[in-house]
A protein has these predicted regions:
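Catalytic cores of the polymerase beta-like nucleotidyltransferase superfamily
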Residues: 1-309
């Protein structure tokens, strides 16, 4: 059947003939079938395309992309994941049909971008931007081209890579807000929170000592600091991650969860309400500065002394 909104068939038509079914596939390498008796059906030379490491649309690429504009992102994703080259006519059609991508649901675009982001060739995202596939989300042209390839050197976690990518775009003038960009693409709450935290942290210089790192971790949490460190290192060509990981590896306390005393312990001293919360914060600050003293007896004695004085 015909397609509506450049993304969905208006009706699902049962295709009886295999060749007719294969003719509706996106790329020739995906238009190959193997019958139950082992007979290979390859009417569009998909095997040859795989041998040549080439991504080529089945039939007219303009028609394929008008049927479903997401196929343009898929072409880039396969290129990034497999290292295949997109042939000229398909590239030309992507350039021509790029405005259709604005009609795609943000969730579908996000999912394809994430798959590209997690490959060993995240610089393919720069190609998507250059073609104008993300014009709905990135309306402007930056003053310099970020080195997206640097993202490949960091941990392959969606959270870290999304935050770093969005902050790079903001840093180089492509978008006004990293957080707003991720929000438009319908990223989850955890990613949005970490992005907002990272943006705030990146307004300052990186900590120069262990105590500074622990204070950051205490305020923002491990996930947010990890994202800020990744973005900071990529943008500035530094290696703060080494210091950050050393602090985590040390096992020293930077959160109430790892403090040797709890709120229940302080209740026994008669503390309650706001006073109890303030005392826990005081003890945490003390332990971050003197990590060897994170012992229940020492902290209870300190709390008692502080309360009496």
């Amino acid at each position: 059947g015909s397609y509506r909104d450049h993304r969905r068939p208006e009706s699902v038509t049962f295709v009886s003939e295999l060749i007719s079914d294969l003719s509706r596939r996106d790329f020739t390498m995906n238009a190959i079938a193997l019958s139950a008796d082992g007979m290979l059906s390859d009417p569009f030379d998909g095997v040859q395309a795989i041998r040549e490491r080439t991504i080529r649309c089945v039939g007219d690429p303009m028609l394929r992309f008008n049927e479903d504009a997401l196929r343009m992102f898929r072409a880039l994703r396969f290129s990034a994941r497999l290292g295949f080259t997109i042939e000229y006519e398909t590239v030309a059609a992507i350039s021509e049909c790029a405005p259709l991508a604005a009609e795609l649901a943000p969730e579908r675009v996000r999912d394809e971008l994430e798959k590209i982001l997690l490959t060993t060739r995240p610089e393919t995202l720069g190609v998507a931007i250059k073609f104008g596939l993300l014009r709905r989300y990135i309306p402007g042209n930056g003053w310099a081209s970020p080195n997206y390839a640097d993202i490949a050197s960091m941990t392959r976690k969606p959270l870290t890579r999304w935050v770093t990518f969005s902050i790079m775009l903001q840093k180089y003038g492509y978008i006004p807000s990293a957080h707003a960009f991720l929000e438009e693409l319908r990223l989850d709450g955890r990613t949005l929170r970490c992005c907002a935290d990272a943006e705030e942290m990146l307004k300052c210089e990186a900590p120069t000592d262990k105590l500074g790192w622990k204070k950051l971790l205490s305020r923002y949490g491990v996930d947010s600091v990890a994202c800020a460190v990744a973005a900071y290192d990529v943008i500035n060509g530094l290696n703060c991650e080494k210091e950050f990981k050393a602090v985590l590896k040390s096992g020293e306390c930077f959160s109430l969860k790892h403090l040797a005393v709890s709120g229940d312990d302080l209740l026994s001293l008669g503390l309650k309400g706001p006073e109890l919360g303030e005392m826990l914060k005081f003890l945490l600050d003390y332990v971050m500065e003197y990590p060897d003293n994170n012992k229940r007896e020492i902290l209870l004695e300190l709390a008692k002394y502080s309360e009496e004085s």
